[in-house]
């Protein structure tokens, strides 16, 4: 199984709704240049042309700052770039099919919501990381499954690959993970609305040392 040291720290994800292309571009470079290791491109409600343009911008910035880029549920886009990974949700393509298309040298992450069984299956089938959440109520998704911190404590007993948490996480509640210490913490509005993204990265680095 491919291991990558960049599967750690704050894991920003693009919001579904952008105020404007200009504001997205401005905040995007701030975030990618803030010291993160990994970034996810996740845009589901745009034209193909606009999605490709924003992806190209994101890709170039990730190359510039040596940040691992993950594409959410778009294997057609992912297979055209040898150096990007793929994140798979519950109703998306399964990991076996993704591996056949992308090969064994790509990073593939799996959403497990609050299911230890899903995580064990993902690990057994070659996932590089698993994601749990929503950890808190969130406005980023209309429908979500809450995951308790107790589930994470149990997960850490059985899962050897990196663990990510997501959902409603911000600079105020991020410290609730001090004890559990997940490998990655995904943030959407929690970092895209932050004036100084490096502040969030510093908090994560402090308790994950």
Where in this protein do the model-derived segments appear?
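Short alpha-helical segments enriched in small residues
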Residues: 148-149
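A short, polar/charged loop-to-alpha-helix boundary motif
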Residues: 93-95, 138-139
């Amino acid at each position: 199984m491919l291991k990558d040291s960049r599967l750690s720290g704050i894991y920003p994800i693009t919001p579904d709704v952008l105020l404007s292309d200009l504001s997205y571009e401005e905040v995007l470079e701030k975030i990618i240049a803030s010291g993160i290791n990994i970034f996810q491109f996740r845009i589901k409600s745009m034209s193909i042309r606009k999605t490709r343009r924003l992806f190209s911008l994101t890709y170039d910035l990730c190359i510039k700052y040596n940040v691992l880029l993950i594409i959410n549920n778009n294997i057609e886009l992912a297979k055209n770039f040898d150096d990007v990974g793929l994140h798979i949700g519950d109703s998306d393509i399964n990991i076996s099919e993704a591996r056949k298309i992308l090969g064994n040298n790509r990073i593939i992450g799996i959403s497990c919501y609050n299911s230890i069984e899903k995580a064990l299956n993902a690990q057994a089938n070659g996932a590089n990381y698993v994601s749990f959440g929503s950890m808190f109520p969130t406005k980023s998704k209309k429908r979500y499954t809450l995951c308790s911190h107790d589930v994470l404590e149990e997960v850490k007993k059985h899962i050897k690959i990196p663990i990510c948490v997501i959902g409603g996480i911000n600079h105020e509640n991020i410290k609730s993970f001090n004890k559990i210490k997940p490998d990655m913490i995904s943030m959407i509005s929690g970092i895209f609305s932050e004036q100084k993204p490096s502040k969030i990265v510093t908090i994560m680095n402090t308790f994950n040392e």
